[in-house]
Amino acid sequence: MQNHHRYVPMRQTVSVDEIAKLKKIKKPEFVVFNLDTQFGRGSHWAVLYRNLEGRFEIFDSLGVTPQKKKLLKKWLPKTFSVIYNTTKFQKSDSTRCGMYCLYFIHEKFFNLDLELHELLKTIFSKNLDKNEEKVMSFYQRGH
């Protein structure tokens, strides 16, 4: 699918507790959010994406754990039907979660027709070191 000239809105970054306060999220639209609340110091970046069918996908480079699902359910509107990735793609000692988010958005933009898990299989490896190299290479190329 060619999306070179397609506009997909992306809102400002928000904290997890501000997601529910967002006005209507368009189809498609990206929201980068931090898993900390607005008065916290910030903890980890993730992406909320509303796909063309209106379903929501959450990409988290460290994987959505049961603890994170509980946190997200607390802050996401009850009407959201959400698909999460539970697979970890980023090393635990890495601080590049924001870079992973932007890399995911870039890849998703050119593959809007792919479901979350399909896309993740094509862009990431089970080898976390290779994923780190891929994300860093993406930035070194000037994206």
Give residue ranges: language-model regions.
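Conserved active-site-adjacent core of cysteine acyl-enzyme catalytic domains
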Residues: 1-36
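Histidine (H) residue identity feature
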Residues: 4-5, 44, 106, 117, ...
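Cysteine protease-like catalytic core of ubiquitin/ubiquitin-like
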Residues: 27-110
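Polar/charged alpha-helical tracts
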Residues: 17-24, 70, 74, 107, ...
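Contiguous terminal or domain-adjacent regions
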Residues: 109-143
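Alpha-helix initiation/capping motif
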Residues: 9-18, 34, 66-73, 124-125, ...
